From Swiss-Prot:
GO terms for molecular function: 2 iron, 2 sulfur cluster binding; dihydroxy-acid dehydratase activity; magnesium ion binding. Binds 1 [2Fe-2S] cluster per subunit. This cluster acts as a Lewis acid cofactor. Mg(2+) binds at residues 81, 123-124, 491. It catalyses: (2R)-2,3-dihydroxy-3-methylbutanoate = 3-methyl-2-oxobutanoate + H2O; (2R,3R)-2,3-dihydroxy-3-methylpentanoate = (S)-3-methyl-2-oxopentanoate + H2O. The gene is ilvD. The keyword ATP-binding does not apply. Keywords: 2Fe-2S, Amino-acid biosynthesis, Branched-chain amino acid biosynthesis, Iron, Iron-sulfur, Lyase, Magnesium, Metal-binding. HAMAP family: IlvD (MF_00012). This is Dihydroxy-acid dehydratase. The keyword Plastid does not apply.
Length: 619
């Protein structure tokens, strides 16, 4: 039977000094035999998805102590990708994931915590904490701050549900008046919470449910709704129970690596494909699986993408459908229920709240559940009042969305498409693969071929788009923006948003070794691996080269003869120390970012660090 980790610092004569310090934090004699639970918070006033978390850590802490544990709270950093977007601040977003994972490891191991509750929400925070949970493998429960309410705006006499992306597109649309743009800006982000569409933050919080590490409703119940308080309360009680089951009952089934098994990662990716989640989730699931020492790879994602249908389309893939609408249709448990009925998930996987996922679905899938409380829970509605206060309203819809033929969530028979919402493409320009969010691609451009227009920074591409130098049929190539080449693998949300504003969203393709925001739609292909900075073929593309994209057959090809590509590669290698580097660009790369670039790996491996690279053993 494993001993409580915390006893390293709370038991024995030689730990008198440590106990003295624990006492200075408020612990009493009776506390030294209890599990010490880390409350891993991420409150910050910089991020709307985290601005309301300040008091929620202490809410969880009180429930932990009521259940018989000792709670100790600390915070990680949190970067707002939307505020960091479109300038050099975005270089820091993906690297912050590793810092978050490390900071959790440092705090939990330095103080010998027995278990943890992870309070996350936005883009890199949930993945960073998930990586830490897999790395540490101590009992863990995830609870997020919840989605923002969608904005409501009246334009030309019609009410629209809007979000951050709509504001960005409007700002670049010269046909919109300054007044309408300001109305959109003031309406797009009305409350605290993670941005209201199926962007990266909400995608990851939904996947935490599928992995079995979060409570039902984690991904979909609004940050402002009173129902969300129950998740925090239950998280506090659940983690104490899990800690006791492991340390006192020798029950290893509660550990993150047992809950988030290979099959659970398949479930999460299956959900991701079915709901058309952010392409960033691919990076994060690969990274978390690596921390769990699981052999879960791009090949597994490709395999799943070929058999899983698209059962839901949410902004940005369609307008006017946001997380509040997904919740009304039964949330993530409803999508998992449809996947289960189609035989596409492993329902025997354990979860932190139920013996198996199948047992959870029996209670929480609204097509199966007989519980009136569950049905009431999924009728939670937006309050419609701008606020930064959690749990501030308790409005409910009159009825649920149970339409599985034309509703927000479809059954497999009535799927939006038989192919899912994400796909892996392979070809000479992406030997290790690249990712496209097919849920956001118009059917008319699932196959596409056009001349390349090459840019060696996002900034140059944006200037060309806004300067009307891009025309219908072009394939925009943005390179040297990968994990090493950026460094930091910037998101390309502004280029795709500006293409929309120019009326080119369905007329051009964009290919990059960088990545895309969860708010991106259109023929946007990212994570091209190997990246240009690692000698990838994307580094050899020249203006005018034809690039062909075939999503149905999962192909992407640079249509240039092999001998010509060999000649270009030799020419590049002849540059010596300047080989596989971008032309001069005005970009300050700090020592912190240089350190990240030295250790990071390909997007095909989750862009995680590999210390063997520094030791000369890695690729």
């Amino acid at each position: 039977m494993p001993a409580y980790r915390s006893r390293t610092t709370t038991h024995g004569r030689n730990m008198a000094g440590a106990r003295g310090l624990w006492r200075a934090t408020g612990m009493k004699d009776s506390d030294f035999g209890k599990p010490i639970i880390a409350v891993v918070n991420s409150f910050t006033q910089f991020v709307p998805g985290h601005v309301h978390l300040k008091d929620l850590g202490q809410l969880v802490a009180r429930e932990i102590e009521a259940a018989g544990g000792v709670a100790k709270e600390f915070n990680t950093i949190a970067v707002d990708d939307g505020i960091a977007m479109g300038h050099d601040g975005m270089l820091y977003s993906l690297p912050s994931r590793e810092l978050i994972a490390d900071s959790v490891e440092y705090m939990v191991n330095a103080h010998c915590a027995d278990a943890m509750v992870c309070i996350s929400n936005c883009d890199k925070i949930t993945p960073g904490m998930l990586m830490a949970a897999m790395r540490l493998n101590i009992p863990a429960v995830f609870v997020s701050g919840g989605p923002m309410e969608a904005g409501k705006v009246v334009l030309k006499g019609k009410t629209h549900a809007v979000d951050l992306i709509d504001a960005m597109v409007a700002a670049a649309d010269s046909s919109m008046s300054d007044e309408d743009v300001q109305t959109m800006e003031r309406s797009a982000c009305p409350t605290c919470g993670s941005c209201s569409g199926m962007f990266t933050a909400n995608s990851m919080n939904c996947l935490a449910e599928a992995l079995g590490l979060a409570l039902p409703g984690n991904g979909s119940v609004l940050a402002t709704h009173a129902d969300r308080k129950r998740l925090f309360v239950e998280a506090g009680h659940t983690i104490v129970d899990l800690a006791r089951r492991y340390y006192e009952g020798d029950d290893e089934s509660v550990l993150p690596r047992k809950v988030a098994s290979f099959e659970a990662f398949e479930n999460a990716m299956t959900l991701d494909i079915a709901m058309g989640g952010s392409t960033n989730t691919v990076l994060h699931l690969l990274a978390a699986a690596r921390e769990a020492e699981l052999d879960f790879s791009m090949k597994d994602i490709d395999r799943l993408s070929r058999k899983v249908p698209c059962l839901s389309k949410i902004a940005p893939s369609v307008s006017d459908v946001h997380m509040e609408d997904v919740h009304r249709a039964g949330g993530i448990m409803a999508i998992l229920g449809e996947l289960d009925r189609a035989g596409l998930i492993h329902n025997s996987c354990p979860t932190v709240h139920s013996e198996t996922l199948g047992a959870a679905l029996a209670r929480w899938d609204i097509r199966q559940s007989n519980s009136e409380a569950v049905r009431t829970f999924y009728r939670a509605a937006p309050g419609g009042v701008p606020t930064q206060v959690a749990f501030s309203q308790d409005r409910r819809y009159d009825e649920l969305d149970l339409d599985r033929q034309k509703g927000v969530i479809r059954d497999a028979e009535h799927a939006f498409s038989k192919d899912g919402g994400l796909a892996v493409l392979y070809g000479n320009i992406a030997l290790d693969g690249c990712i496209v969010k097919t849920a956001g691609v118009d059917a008319s451009i699932l196959t596409f071929s056009g001349p390349a227009k090459v840019f060696e920074s996002q900034d140059d591409a944006v200037s060309a788009i806004l300067g009307n130098k891009i025309v219908a049929g072009d394939v925009i190539v943005i390179r040297y923006e990968g994990p090493r080449g950026g460094p930091g693998m910037q998101e390309m949300l502004y280029p795709t948003s500006y293409l929309k504003s120019k009326g080119l969203g369905k007329a051009c393709a964009l290919i990059t070794d960088g990545r895309f925001s969860g708010g991106t739609s259109g023929l946007s292909i990212g994570h091209v691996s190997p990246e240009a900075a690692e000698g990838g073929l994307i580094g050899l593309v020249r203006n005018g080269d034809r690039i062909s994209i075939d999503i149905p057959n999962r192909g992407i090809t640079l249509d240039v003869a092999a001998d010509e590509l060999s000649r270009r590669a030799e020419e590049e290698e002849a540059k010596g120390d300047k080989a596989w580097q971008p032309k001069d660009r005005k970009r300050k790369v700090s020592a912190a970012l240089q350190a990240y670039a030295m250790l990071t790996t390909s997007a095909a491996n989750g862009a995680v660090r590999d210390v063997n690279r520094r030791l000369g053993k890695g690729k």
